[in-house]
Amino acid sequence: IVYSDRNLRFTWSQLNQRVDDMAKGLIAVGVERGTHVGIWAANVPDWLTLLYACAKIGAVYVTVNTNYKQAELEYLCQNSDMHTLCIVNGEKDSDSVQMTYTMLPELKTCERGHLKSERFPYMKNVIYVGQEKHRGMYNTAEILLLGNNVEDDRLTELKSKVDCHDVVNMQY
């Protein structure tokens, strides 16, 4: 995998390891088989990593269009029973961090991973895809670090339960 604009290259082996590490991080924050994970990002390296990580553990990747406005984002998150929303800021003239705070004002006061929202009862996590830190959100480095607490056997167990008939992607 090559991202020439970022001077970044992954061999398939390196990508596989990064995906496993990301999958373990997702498991650490409660994502498992059947969990709905929204990814609101354009073509950045960890979009691919998150997509494959979801697929490996049987989570359902929910496509979030980068052109969505506030009402569309809120409808999607509510209607899809989204558990975790992964965001990248600054895509296509939108401020996804601010839109997320508008949708989930509880993020500003809750502990990461313990979101409780009446409007979005399934939503527990928001992950900022990048190194920036935002109140109430994990960032990529923190997710990868949390994954160190997940045993390889747990990842292997979830991977073994994935079936070719499982839903891998939900699109709106």
What is the meaning of each model-derived region?
Residues 29, 57-145:
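Structural core segment of the AMP-binding/adenylate-forming
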Residues 165-172:
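ATP phosphate-binding P-loop of adenylate-forming
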